[in-house]
Amino acid sequence: DIYKFYKLVENESHPHDYIDSQPEINERMRAILVDWLIDVHTKFELSLETLYLTINIIDRFLAVKTVPRRELQLVGISAMLMASKYEEIWPPEVNDFVCLSDRAYTHEQILAMEKTILNKLEWTLTVPTPFVFLVRFIKAAVPDQELENMAHFMSELGMMNYATLMYCPSMVAASAVFAARCTLNKAPLWNETLKLHTGYSQEQLMDCARLLVGFHSTLGNGKLRVVYRKYSDPQKGAVAVLPPAKLLSEGSASQHS
């Protein structure tokens, strides 16, 4: 079973805390990059697999290579190019990315960075991102469209925020489904079927789910609004506009865990 395999190997391809080893890059810069890439991803109408793989490539690369601040966007562009080639039938061309970055980088620079990243990551692009788990866990929740949209929204909020990297991909995915169920007041919030399919109990998901709901509650005030805009669209059920889960908001969750 491919999911059992992914569960076994997810920690091998999951980057852990690296930001302190990057002298010129901080969590905020990473968030700005991811925010921009989610926008680019939407413009190109790429698959969600491509988006999640892009962010995984960036984080794994930053965990093994010091990158100057001026090259961070170049890493992002090259990662999305690689992920697109891997996941899409019709990937964007290098020149599309040159134009998108307002010609900040040349065709040659993007291809050279792509090669550097591939070599550093030893050409490993078949990795379990939160997305592979999310699709399965949403199915196990027997969702309506609103729950599906909300779980994707929660997961992309997690992707934006460096703090989420503390948790392995399957836990982020399970927490996104749990946080979505809490936000939409689904009863029960968690059940044996979900526990069986995810491998996590409600208690195990509390911390990560609380983190995701915390991102939701501060989202409207921030400058990085791409995920908020994307999920405020009626096509996505405007789930971003719904009030954050009270059960998991700071202060109240301790009584329920």
From Swiss-Prot:
Pfam families reported for this sequence: Cyclin_C, Cyclin_N
Subunit structure: Interacts with the CDC2 protein kinase to form a serine/threonine kinase holoenzyme complex also known as maturation promoting factor (MPF). The cyclin subunit imparts substrate specificity to the complex.
One Gene Ontology molecular-function label: cyclin-dependent protein serine/threonine kinase regulator activity
Record key words, sorted: Cell cycle, Cell division, Cyclin, Mitosis
UniProt similarity note: Belongs to the cyclin family. Cyclin AB subfamily.
Function: Essential for the control of the cell cycle at the G2/M (mitosis) transition.
Gene Ontology annotations for the cellular component aspect, listed alphabetically: cyclin-dependent protein kinase holoenzyme complex; cytoplasm; nucleus
SMART domains, per database record: CYCLIN, Cyclin_C
GO BP term, example: cell division
PROSITE patterns for this protein: CYCLINS
InterPro entries in the record: Cyclin (IPR039361), Cyclin-like_dom (IPR013763), Cyclin-like_sf (IPR036915), Cyclin_A/B-like (IPR046965), Cyclin_C-dom (IPR004367), Cyclin_N (IPR006671), Cyclins_cyclin-box (IPR048258)
Record protein name field: G2/mitotic-specific cyclin S13-7
Domain of life: Eukaryota
